[in-house]
Swiss-Prot record:
Database matches in InterPro entries: dITP/XTP_pyrophosphatase (IPR020922), ITPase-like_fam (IPR029001), RdgB/HAM1 (IPR002637)
HAMAP family membership: Non_canon_purine_NTPase (MF_01405)
Organism: Streptococcus agalactiae serotype V (strain ATCC BAA-611 / 2603 V/R)
Residues engaged in binding substrate: T131, H132, N133, E134, G135, K136, S194, F277, G278, Y279, D280, K300, H305, R306
Subunit structure, interactors included: Homodimer.
Entry's cofactor comment: Binds 1 Mg(2+) ion per subunit.
Stretches for region Unknown: 1-127
An annotated GO cellular component: cytosol
Cofactor(s) listed: Mg(2+)
PANTHER family cross-referenced by the UniProt entry: INOSINE TRIPHOSPHATE PYROPHOSPHATASE, INOSINE TRIPHOSPHATE PYROPHOSPHATASE/HAM1 PROTEIN
Protein name, per record: dITP/XTP pyrophosphatase
GO terms for MF: dITP diphosphatase activity; ITP diphosphatase activity; metal ion binding; nucleotide binding; ribonucleoside triphosphate phosphatase activity; XTP diphosphatase activity
Catalytic activity line of the entry: XTP + H2O = XMP + diphosphate + H(+); dITP + H2O = dIMP + diphosphate + H(+); ITP + H2O = IMP + diphosphate + H(+)
Enzyme class: hydrolase
């Protein structure tokens, strides 16, 4: 067995683990929390026939995050290919074609809803991202893949009409896209309206970030216009900015779910980095020196406005998903 110390720390969830001589776990919290974690821990390890996994739970708000952490440890230690998938409010643990564990929420889930498996494409929860942008979809796919969800985008639905972004706020635009497309497709849809807010420009480009340089805007033209607008702003503190994301999830006959997040930083004086898209080459992250375009995909997902918003979303998503 390896001596690796595994750790996962996200908002509301903090787990530590290692492999030793026997299965064991500890946790902070009340007796109810202890019993809930004990049940998940022992059922999973018994089903997968795993010995020697030791777990310490500092904080937990998500059963899915706990199962995903344990499965990731087991996969790394034993070179297995176990997957954790969300389906109709339940959490499924499987490997290849074998289902090992079904973890239901406390309030259960309806049989009719759970066993709606008319074909393989209906297995596993799917989210339709309301965008044609493959770069944005790639980020969401990496984030949601860790959460057991399959991701589609509008390129999979070429006959859908374009939804005009006529809102004056990020939430208005995100809600308009998600709710319209959900009604047209009957699917669960997530729309993110994201943009860059520059303090020296009164919050611009804001909801106009994608078309800041005009109707024929490109990333390069938008970046050039932003540098032009800030040409006489020399003090770094006055070049402060935030990437903002509003996520809206909509589904038929449901009240939409809304979360928001921001990523603070500064606008540089020249583009740097080859990764990312949009204003990433100009956005200096936090108090550091690297731009968002100089971060790896994993680093960006951990820090970014979109990554933060998705993590917030997944804290409230399971409960919302089960609501009538």
């Amino acid at each position: 067995m390896t001596k690796t110390i595994f750790e996962s720390k996200t908002e509301g969830n903090w787990f530590l683990g290692s492999f030793q001589a026997f299965n064991y776990f500890t946790c902070f919290g009340n007796d109810e929390s202890y019993e809930a974690i004990q049940d998940v821990f022992h059922r999973l390890l018994s089903t997968l026939k795993v010995e020697g996994l030791q777990l310490h739970v500092v904080q937990m708000t998500s059963d899915f995050q706990l199962l995903a952490f344990l499965v990731d440890m087991i996969n790394q230690e034993y070179s297995r290919h176990i997957k954790v998938t969300q389906h109709k409010g339940a959490i499924l643990v499987s490997e290849d074609d074998q289902l090992f564990l079904v973890h239901l929420p406390k309030e259960g889930t309806s049989l009719e809803k759970f066993f709606d498996l008319k074909n393989d494409n209906n297995f596993g929860d799917t989210i339709l991202i309301a965008t044609h942008n493959e770069g944005k979809t790639k980020e969401f796919r990496e984030l949601f893949g860790k959460l057991g969800l399959k991701v589609e985008n509008l390129n999979d639905y070429p006959d859908l009409p374009e939804v005009e972004e006529t809102g004056m706020t990020f939430e208005e635009n995100a809600r308009l896209k998600a709710e319209t497309i959900s009604k047209l497709t009957g699917k669960m849809v997530i729309s993110d309206d994201s943009g860059l807010k520059v303090d020296a420009l009164g919050g611009l480009p804001g909801v106009w970030s994608a078309r800041f340089s005009g109707p024929d805007a490109t990333d390069a033209r938008n970046n050039a216009k932003l540098l032009h607008e800030l040409a006489m702003v020399f003090d770094k503190e006055r070049r402060s900015a935030q990437f903002h994301t509003t996520l809206v999830v909509s589904a038929p006959n449901k009240e939409s779910l809304v979360v928001e997040a921001e990523w603070p930083g500064y606008i540089g004086t020249e583009p740097k980095g080859e990764n990312g898209f949009g204003y990433d080459p100009l956005f200096i992250v936090g108090e550091g020196s690297r731009t968002a375009a100089e971060l790896s995909a994993q680093e960006k997902n951990n820090l970014s406005h979109r990554g933060q918003a998705v993590r917030k979303l997944m804290e409230v998503f399971p409960k919302w998903q089960l609501e009538n």
